[in-house]
A protein has these predicted regions:
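Phosphate-binding/catalytic loop of phosphoryl-transfer enzymes
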Residues: 1-38, 72, 76-84
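Glycine-rich beta-strand-to-loop/alpha-helix junction loops that act as flexible
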Residues: 3-5, 91-100, 118
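Structural motif
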Residues: 17-18, 92-94, 113-114
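Glycine-rich phosphate-binding loop plus the immediately following alpha-helix
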Residues: 20-70, 124, 128
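Adenine-nucleotide phosphate-binding core of ATP-dependent small-molecule kinases
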Residues: 52-92, 99-102
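Catalytic cores of alpha/beta
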Residues: 102-109
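Glycine-rich phosphate-binding/hydrolytic loop that grips phosphoryl groups
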Residues: 113-135
């Protein structure tokens, strides 16, 4: 999974082939869609592009403040998407991207099932390059 502007879930088959995927708006994109597409909902605070600081994320499951409720709803929707994908695939999940740490922090499906791999794309490119050079 790549948790960036879009949460991209990619299934890889046992023999290493593309097995399909799912795409949903990422954390910031969902918040922006609510703020821009709904009268009365505020814009959320501008956060750095690289991460969502834990101290600004609401810890309550049902926050009373509007922005906190928006943030909590988005993270719960993303986690539910990941949980259903994991149940359907029955495999391990690797997550990378700017929101990966936020999702892993709030994941309750077992740490052995969701592995944070910050440089997953770079590792894949290195593996591909090694395979190409050995052919």
């Amino acid at each position: 999974m790549d948790a960036g502007t879009v949460l991209s879930l990619t299934r890889v088959t046992a023999d290493g082939c593309f097995g399909g995927g799912q795409l949903i708006p990422g954390y910031r994109l969902q918040l922006r869609a609510m703020a821009e597409g709904t009268v009365g909902l505020p814009s959320t605070p501008k956060l750095p592009d690289c991460e969502v600081p834990r101290e600004v994320f609401p810890q309550e499951v049902f926050p009373q403040q509007t922005v906190a409720a928006m943030q909590r709803g988005v993270i719960q929707a993303m986690l539910a998407t990941i949980a259903v994908a994991q149940q359907n695939s029955k495999g391990l999940l690797w997550i990378c991207g700017g929101d990966a740490e936020l999702l892993q922090t709030h994941w309750s499906g077992g740490t052995e099932l969701l592995q944070l791999e910050g440089d997953l794309q770079l590792q894949a490119l290195l593996d591909l390059a090694a395979g190409i050079s050995s052919d």
